[in-house]
Amino acid sequence: MAGTTGERPFSDIITSVRYWVIHSITIPALFIAGWLFVSTGLAYDVFGTPRPNEYYSQVRQELPIISDRLEGKQQINEFLKEVK
């Protein structure tokens, strides 16, 4: 016969009023905090990703695609010269 770990059964936890009082506040708060984190642009600053209007410069409006694998380094260097 299996022993007990002494922990409360999951069904007891999710049917308790205390669980729902705590989670009815924390779950919406986490959602709102995440939404604000992204909508204010702080996520772009924290993770260092470019904002949607910063992906391409005014000079270069296309993707820098490497077309020849043997001359890839040369193509990358040409792309970097254009960016500067």
Swiss-Prot record:
Residues where heme binds: H23
Protein localization: Cellular thylakoid membrane
UniProt remark on cofactor binding: With its partner (PsbF) binds heme. PSII binds additional chlorophylls, carotenoids and specific lipids.
Cystine residue pairs: none
Annotated PROSITE patterns: CYTOCHROME_B559 (PS00537)
The organism's place on the tree of life at top rank: Bacteria
Membrane topology reported for the UniProt record: Single-pass membrane protein
GO molecular function: electron transfer activity; heme binding; iron ion binding
Biological role stated in the UniProt entry: This b-type cytochrome is tightly associated with the reaction center of photosystem II (PSII). PSII is a light-driven water:plastoquinone oxidoreductase that uses light energy to abstract electrons from H(2)O, generating O(2) and a proton gradient subsequently used for ATP formation. It consists of a core antenna complex that captures photons, and an electron transfer chain that converts photonic excitation into a charge separation.
Description of how the protein assembles with itself and partners: Heterodimer of an alpha subunit and a beta subunit. PSII is composed of 1 copy each of membrane proteins PsbA, PsbB, PsbC, PsbD, PsbE, PsbF, PsbH, PsbI, PsbJ, PsbK, PsbL, PsbM, PsbT, PsbX, PsbY, PsbZ, Psb30/Ycf12, peripheral proteins PsbO, CyanoQ (PsbQ), PsbU, PsbV and a large number of cofactors. It forms dimeric complexes.
Family under the similarity heading: Belongs to the PsbE/PsbF family.
HAMAP family per UniProt: PSII_PsbE (MF_00642)
Protein name in the entry: Cytochrome b559 subunit alpha
Source species of the chain: Cyanothece sp. (strain PCC 7425 / ATCC 29141)
